[in-house]
Amino acid sequence: MTHASNTHPVTELTKELIARPSVTPLDEGCQTLMAERLAAIGFNIEPMVFEDTTNMWARRGNEGPVFCFAGHTDVVPAGDLSRWHTPPFEPTIIDGYLYGRGAADMKGSLAAMIVATERFVAKHPNHPGSIAFLITSDEEGPFINGTTRVIDTLEARNEKITWTLVGEPSSTLKLGDVVKNGRRGSLTANLTVKGIQGHVAYPHLADNPIHKAAPFLAELSQTHWDNGNEFFPPTSMQIANINGGTGASNVIPGTLEVMFNFRYSTEVTAEILIERVEALLTAHELDYDISWTFNGLPFLTGEGPLLDATRHAIRQITGYDTDPQTTGGTSDGRFIAPTGAKVLELGPVNATIHKVNECVKIDDLEQLALCYEVILEQLLC
């Protein structure tokens, strides 16, 4: 095992960002560091603070088209510190990998974006169009006061983004082997099935909501929602939480609470899913309350300049072709896509994200910056 320093500019900036313990929704000065670098190359910096969330909109240029790097400075908690090989907020290079919370998700991407932009502007100081950065500290948290609020602000003044590259860790086995050119929609239900609480010895004096709901839940879990399409897998429904009872063995509960989530394709809409679920509840003659939370619409970036530029960049820098996919969880791209912007995600290998000993290959950081730079050249030169 070797512990070594590294002078790659992307690695050094990534280390500076990791050293700031920006557990969501904290930013801990990450955006200030980024803003200083961007201001030095002609960006107008516009901080946008909403409640406990720090956001930044930075832009260089006043004309279209607008290419936007999007990302987040917040990270998930480190978890059990005893399971980390090195302190999570003390960036350490071991055997060619940089360890630390946020190394892959997504401070490495942020550093690559900054360095790529610095290089691009140095070569093309009078580039056409505009380059922008949309950065938040509320991606890993409730995503209430982050990207969605910045987009609301931009939309209110009719400031449009043409293309967005999100730095989420899209890669699976090696850098750039997968890019995300879309995401499924996400819809969450909070269901309360009502019964009558009572003693288990006197079931005729009570009404057990668990027994009543069981056939409904069985049918819900076995329902086929759609077949998906060439871009999206079939819609999936998963029960995430069930809670009922007092904890005592002799009490029939009065209510049953169930939370379930849909990850849905473009073959259905949230409205269709809601209608089908509520029809199923009615068919099972349940007494219920239900509330719905829209977490994001599905989006897809098909063939066009952004996907073409990204494919070209990955092929040029890595020597292999990328695979555009729409699988996985949601990202802040879901808040940007409804404005009409084309959205794509390209970032490091995601094998260690949200885990102890999160790490990124340092050679990948430099290659990622080169990919980002080529994408800028393809779209703005």
Curated annotation (Swiss-Prot):
The record's keywords, sorted A to Z, are: Amino-acid biosynthesis, Cobalt, Diaminopimelate biosynthesis, Hydrolase, Lysine biosynthesis, Metal-binding, Zinc
Pfam entry (one)? Peptidase_M20
Question: What pathway is it annotated to?
Answer: Amino-acid biosynthesis; L-lysine biosynthesis via DAP pathway; LL-2,6-diaminopimelate from (S)-tetrahydrodipicolinate (succinylase route): step 3/3
Instruction: Indicate whether NAD appears among the record's keywords.
Output: no
Q: What class of enzyme is it?
A: hydrolase
Q: Where does Zn(2+) 2 bind?
A: D105, E140, H354
Q: What does this protein's record comment on cofactor binding?
A: Binds 2 Zn(2+) or Co(2+) ions per subunit.
Catalytic residue list:
D74, E139
Q: What does the record give as cofactor? A: Zn(2+); Co(2+)
Binding sites annotated in the UniProt record for Zn(2+) 1: H72, D105, E168
Q: Which Gene3D superfamilies match?
A: Zn peptidases
Example of a GO MF term: acetylornithine deacetylase activity
Q: What catalytic activity does the UniProt entry give for this protein?
A: N-succinyl-(2S,6S)-2,6-diaminopimelate + H2O = (2S,6S)-2,6-diaminopimelate + succinate
Provide the E.C. number(s) assigned to this enzyme.
Answer: 3.5.1.18
Does Glycoprotein show up as a keyword for this record? no
| Top-level lineage group | Bacteria
Q: Where are the transmembrane segments?
A: none
Provide the assembly information: Homodimer.
PANTHER family xrefs: ACETYLORNITHINE DEACETYLASE, N-ACETYL-L-CITRULLINE DEACETYLASE
Name the protein family.
Belongs to the peptidase M20A family. DapE subfamily.
Its annotated function is as follows: Catalyzes the hydrolysis of N-succinyl-L,L-diaminopimelic acid (SDAP), forming succinate and LL-2,6-diaminopimelate (DAP), an intermediate involved in the bacterial biosynthesis of lysine and meso-diaminopimelic acid, an essential component of bacterial cell walls.
Question: HAMAP family per the record?
Answer: DapE
Protein name stated in the entry: Succinyl-diaminopimelate desuccinylase
